[in-house]
């Protein structure tokens, strides 16, 4: 399959396709969001704008196969922080199907469910350039690419390659991670400006990551 690149025409093509078919174009950004931070929000918002998507859904994982369960706080806190982070933010919403399903969160199972529930939606699954390299190892990847269009986020001039169809979006590198924020808090440092203030206030109020 050919590699797809984001060109000046990509957004126009997506918008024309949407007008012709009346199908919704929805992005999905999955993650542990432990906690959500500003880099997550920038990626979601910029992909939505650059591709002309109707909306991007932030989808918290229940038990991701690649994350240490010991480092993950209760889902009620992760969900509440997501809610606080996107208050009054246009074009972003939350999808909770993986939390509701429980168990290990395989993307194939999730997208099969969502495409069956929303047959009038074209889904765009957003991943980082580093994750594109691992697509061959994803659970049922050859079936997954028939359900969803992958969107790879890479920093400008960074070139990643894959045999799977990927739309590339260039974004400046924002070097923020959830583990960095957790480490700051454990060491008694305030992670100011790394995440929304409402989220930081909630973390402080609930005594998380101490």
From Swiss-Prot:
**UniProt-listed Pfam families:** CTP_transf_like
Similarity annotation: Belongs to the NadD family.
Q: Which organism is it from?
A: Streptococcus pyogenes serotype M1
Per the entry, what this protein does is:
Catalyzes the reversible adenylation of nicotinate mononucleotide (NaMN) to nicotinic acid adenine dinucleotide (NaAD).
Organism taxonomic ancestry = Bacteria, Bacillati, Bacillota, Bacilli, Lactobacillales
- Spell out where the chain crosses the membrane: none
**HAMAP family registered for this protein in UniProt:** NaMN_adenylyltr
One GO biological process term: NAD biosynthetic process
| Record-linked InterPro entries | Cyt_trans-like (IPR004821), NadD/NMNAT (IPR005248), Rossmann-like_a/b/a_fold (IPR014729)
**What name goes with this protein?**
Probable nicotinate-nucleotide adenylyltransferase
Enzyme class, broadest EC rank: transferase
Q: EC no.?
A: 2.7.7.18
